[in-house]
Amino acid sequence: MKKRVNTYLAIAITTYCNYQCFYCKKGGESISKERETISFDDVKKIIANAYANGIANFRITGGEPTSVSYFGELIEYIMKFKDTKVRINTNGFRILEYIDVLTKYKEYIDIVFSVDSLSKYICGVHFPKYLSQNVIEITRALRKNKISVRYNIVVTKLNECEVRELVQKAIDELDVNVKLLDLNRFSEYLGYSNEVTGKEAYDLWQRLFVPMSNFYDFLCQISTHSQIEWTTSLIGKKHGIPMSCYFRGDNWVQVKDSTRGARYSEFCRKNCLLYKKGECQEGVFSLFLSSNLVLHLSGCKNDSIHYDLNGRDNEQIERAFKSLLNLLN
């Protein structure tokens, strides 16, 4: 392993998801819209190359990663490498099937659980990722085994009325951390009943967007102290959107506020038309492997720095990692 770099590799191992959330897009976090899953052999090859290039932090996402048959084996594989950490983004679908392996490596793993509301329906809109009794039981089982859990809450005009109560339930009753996220501006969304694209997608974003400043007074009231810029251990400061954090007892609430702007590389500022047109919001903060084996920066739509790793040998994969890691410096 080369000198460790202070970032992570996110991997969308599948585009399959058991839920269809209105604010998500086809393919989930992957840039691919196809229904596909990375083979275990391919994902192992990429992880080994990432580790050899200094990446020891990994985020497993999708789609819904726990739906993939090799999910447990994947955790075991990553843990074979020294000093690795794994973050798992899930809606809890099959997470308890892997409780043994998660408990085995609990010091190096954290679960990011998507929970957006207290109610299943708000204003007639379905919220599949709500705080159901099943979600509560899964959370308690994970915490009983000392596994770190964080609830990710995507805030919109629809669920804003429930967010404050949800935050306090999460922290005080379930002993989990929380991250509040404002709504990403995509060119397409799954929508309430049908997919929306182009102007319809932009109009939906405008109608639903809630500024995080709506919550700052509340967070100050319930916290003992705060930091204006704070990160978890997977990335360092001065990358992407600066995120504040509010501490309450042993737990915390992190806030992703896109109105604070983001940090970009020199390449972005000088060469990227998408950056110059204001079409990139998240900045540069991590690497991402999409389900079609294309390696890119997280959230980056500039295909001139997308690297197709299908059928590539180790030397070619290493060059791709080096090129993207240079943009993070």
What are these regions (language model features)?
Residues 120-267:
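Radical SAM enzyme [4Fe-4S]-AdoMet core and its adjacent flexible, acidic
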Residues 8, 12, 59, 150, ...:
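Conserved beta-strand segments that form the floor/walls of ligand-binding pockets within enzyme
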Residues 263-329:
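Flexible mid-to-C-terminal extensions adjoining Fe-S/redox cofactors in radical SAM and related proteins
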Residues 2-41, 53, 297-299:
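Canonical Radical SAM [4Fe-4S] cluster-binding loop centered on the CxxxCxxC motif
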Residues 1-7, 19-23, 217-236, 290-296, ...:
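Flexible, acidic/Gly-rich N-terminal and inter-domain linker regions that tether
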Residues 40-60, 68-181:
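Radical SAM/AdoMet-radical enzyme domain recognition
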Residues 23, 27-30, 210-212, 274-278, ...:
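Secreted/processed peptides and extracellular or luminal domains of membrane proteins
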